[in-house]
Amino acid sequence: VAYENPVPAAAVIVCRNDEILLCRRGIGPYLGEWGLPAGYQEVDESIETTAIRETREETGLIIMLTGLHDVMTTRDDPRKAAILVIFEACVVDGELEPGDDCDEVGFFPLNALPEKLAFQNNRIILERLQKGERRPWPTNPNP
C-alpha cells in the first residue's frame, strides 16, 4: 500500500512598521511570484527551526518567533501536499538580502502588495491580514 502523505512546512509572517516581508521566487513553481518566507521541514529539525532557517536562507534576516498564526493543509505546491505551520516573527538581526530560492526580497505595505502572489495559502493569509483579521492559533480546537 502506498500513501501520499503531506509533508511539514513552515511559513513566516514578519511585519515591520505596518509592512510585511515577502520574497520573489527565483525558482519554480510560481517563478517570479511573491510569497512569505517558507519551506519544507528537514528531518533533523523542529518546525520552529524550519521557520527560522528558511527565513534566514531566503531573506538574510535572523528572526525570533513571536507566535503561532495558523496551520493549514494545502496542495498549492504541485510537487507535494503540505501541512503548513504559519508563524509570526520579528527581526532581531541580519541584512535584507535575497538568497536560496528567492531573487528579490522586500517589505511591502499591506495595501500595496505585489500583483503576482504565489500559493493560494499565501493569498488567503495576506487577504486576512489586509482585512485586519488576526488568526492566532485558537485555544478552542473547534472551528
What are the residue ranges of the model-derived segments?
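Conserved N-terminal beta-strand and adjoining loop/helix that marks the start
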Residues: V1-I20, V71
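Surface loops and adjacent helix of pleckstrin homology
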Residues: N5-V7, R25, D101, A118
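Short connector loops at helix/strand junctions that flank enzyme active sites
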Residues: V7-A9, C15, P29-L31, L36, ...
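Conserved Nudix-box catalytic region and its N-terminal flanking loop in Nudix hydrolases
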Residues: C15-E57
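Generic structural signal for secondary-structure transition and capping sites
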Residues: E19, R134-R135
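Short hydrophobic alpha-helix segments
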Residues: R24, H69-M72
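Unchanged
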Residues: Q41-L65, M72-R128, R135-T139
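Short, charged, surface-exposed hinge/linker loops at domain edges
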Residues: N142-P143
